[in-house]
Amino acid sequence: MNNKLTALIFLGLLAIASCKWFNEKSIQNKIDEKIGKNFLGGMAKAVVHKLAKNEFMCVANVDMTKSCDTHCQKASGEKGYCHGTKCKCGVPLSY
């Protein structure tokens, strides 16, 4: 039960971080309070950091909200491609 509660809290914090309702530092402090400063806490903080700096919602090479493509169309007129969590204009995946 405790593991399920921890996972639920973590997913809630990820949702809050990706919506930018709170800043990354406050969410990482909550992770320290709930999970602690151990290996699992470090992993959780790394995931929150990766999602918080994800500006165009690219997840695993997929443009979830089409914001990468929209950004690239406005900026350079080229198609936007997600490379992991980064958006690159006019550079398709080579694999």
Swiss-Prot record:
GO terms for molecular function: toxin activity. It comes from Opistophthalmus carinatus (African yellow leg scorpion). This is Opiscorpine-1. It holds the Pfam family Scorpion_toxin_alpha-beta. It comes from the Eukaryota. The short synthetic peptide (20-54) has antimicrobial activity against the yeasts F.culmorum (IC(50)=8.8 uM) and F.oxysporum (IC(50)=10 uM), and the Gram-negative bacteria E.coli. It is found in: Secreted. One of its GO terms (cellular component) is extracellular region. Expressed by the venom gland. Residues 1-19 form the signal peptide. Residues 55-95 form the BetaSPN-type CS-alpha/beta domain. Belongs to the long chain scorpion toxin family. Class 3 subfamily. Keywords: Antibiotic, Antimicrobial, Disulfide bond, Fungicide, Secreted, Signal, Toxin.
